[in-house]
Design a protein with these regions (language model features):
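Short, Asp-centered acidic motifs that coordinate Mg2+ and/or phosphate
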Residues: 33, 53, 68-69, 149
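Nucleotide donor/acceptor-binding cores
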Residues: 4-6, 118, 148
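Rossmann-like NAD(P)H-binding beta-loop-alpha module
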Residues: 130-158, 164
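N-terminal Rossmann-like dinucleotide-binding module
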Residues: 1-49
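Rossmann-like dinucleotide-binding domain that binds NAD(P)(H)
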Residues: 159-214
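Beta-strand-loop-alpha-helix segment that lines the small-molecule cofactor/substrate pocket
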Residues: 69-76, 80-127, 142
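Conserved SAM-binding strand-loop segment of SAM-dependent methyltransferases
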Residues: 51-58
Length: 214
């Protein structure tokens, strides 16, 4: 492991706040800044974790020369625009899933990474879960034999889970099933096909504005 130190800023402090102790525990990371639109909520989190630099304006954060990389955990529609802004401002990017909501945004992000030479990570968390790592270890040791067929599903409607997912369309969570399948075999997708699987419940459709189970 390199001894190089990186100054990190976390953008979005809902789900994003869960990553603060992880960054603070990493020997190569200095978590020096946080960013959230709601100043009172931002200050509460920053006080809890003793973080000095605080921004309510993302553009102002990107002007900070001390920040090497941003970890984006903002609402999904902001992911691609904020990632592009960060890359063009000279910052490495770690962004929670999904990386974008259109193919065009994905292509633009790939182009920006090529042009800047900076690092971009779509931070899919499932491939770091203990369950996935356990199965991956079994597969790599040959204990699962040769894979003939692999399928995955990602349930959300479970007792005890937060209800934020009800406002999201299912496709926004596709990475949670695609990434572990690809990660298991260290592979890349060769082609993509899609079919619908009916409709979602009426109460969920009203919240998300989407009646389709895709």
């Amino acid at each position: 492991m390199s001894d190089k130190q990186f100054n990190i800023a976390i953008v979005g402090l809902g789900f994003g706040a869960e990553f603060i102790p992880i960054h603070q525990a990493h020997p190569n990371a200095n978590l020096i800044a946080v960013c959230r639109r709601n100043e009172a909520e931002m200050n509460a989190v920053a006080d809890q974790f003793n973080i000095e630099k605080r921004y309510t304006d993302y553009d102002e954060l990107l002007k900070d020369p001390e920040i090497d990389a941003v970890h984006i955990n903002s609402p999904i529609p902001d992911h691609a625009p904020q990632s592009l802004k960060a890359l063009r401002a000279g910052k490495h990017v770690m962004c929670t899933v999904p990386m974008a909501t259109t193919i065009e945004e994905c292509e633009e992000l790939c182009k920006a990474v090529d042009e800047t030479g900076l690092k971009y990570m779509m931070a899919e968390t499932v491939v770091y879960s203990r369950e996935f790592l356990f199965i991956k270890e079994l597969y790599d040791k040959g204990e699962l034999g040769k894979l003939q067929y692999l399928a995955a599903s990602h349930p959300q409607d479970m007792d005890g889970w937060p209800s934020y997912w009800e406002k999201m369309i299912p496709m926004h969570y596709a990475t949670h099933v695609v990434s572990p399948c690809l990660g298991m075999v260290d592979g890349l997708a060769e082609y993509v096909s899609c079919f619908g699987s009916g409709t979602v419940r009426d109460d969920i459709a009203q919240k998300s504005g989407n009646k389709f189970a895709v």
